[in-house]
Amino acid sequence: MKSQIVIFIALVMLGACSGPANSGITQQPTLADYQVGEKWVWKYKGVTTEGEVRSDGEETREIVSVNGVLGMTIGNDTIPVTDIVKPDESETPKYDWPLEVGKKWKYENNWTSQDGTTGNQSQDAEVLSYQEETVAAGTFMAYTIKYTGKTSNSRGYSANEEEVWLYAPAIKNFIKLTQNQGEFSYAEELIDYSKPK
C-alpha cells in the first residue's frame, strides 16, 4: 500500500502548480518557481478499520542541484524538476490545468508496484473550494480537490475509494491528504515547509 501511495504522491508532484492569478485560476509552474534548498516535510499514518497501523512516519523532499540541474529528492530518488513541471498530455490527468473552483474531470492511473502487482485507479475529480486551510506547518490558501472512484489490482483486490487533497499553490505542493480505501484509512499532513531566505 505504501508503494502505491509513494507512486501516487510522485504523480501529484508532477502536477505542482504556481499561485493563482486574480481570476482565481492556477496555472502549472515553471522551472524558475523552484529554488535549491526548498524543503517539505510530511507526517503520515495508515490504519485499518481494525486499528492495525500499516504505515507511520515522516517523508522529506528537498530541491537540490546535481551538476547544475535542479532535482527533487523523493526517498532515495532524485527527480529532475523539468520532469515535475512538464505538462501532462493525458486525457485523464491527475490535475486538469488550469485549476479553478468547480472544475471536474476524470482521472485514471495504471500502475505496477515494486513486487510486480499491477493495478488501476479510476476516479472522478472535482475542485470544491479555494480558501485558507491550517495544518501543522501553518496556514495556506489551498484548493480542496476531491477524488472518488475505485481501485483494483491483479491480486483480486478491489475497493471504493475517496481522497481529499488540500493543495497550496504558494508552496507548489499538497498540505494534507486523507484517503479512505475499503478497510484502510491514510492521512498525510505537512508539518514543515522552508526555503532559503
Summary of predicted features, one role per range:
Residues 5-14:
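Sec-dependent N-terminal signal peptides
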Residues 6-7, 28, 93, 128:
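Hydrophobic alpha-helical context, especially transmembrane and signal-peptide helices
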Residues 17-80, 85-86, 109-197:
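Acidic, serine/threonine-rich low-complexity disordered tracts
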Residues 80-101:
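Intrinsically disordered, low-complexity, charged/polar segments
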Residues 105-107:
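Short Pro-Gly-centered flexible turn/kink motifs
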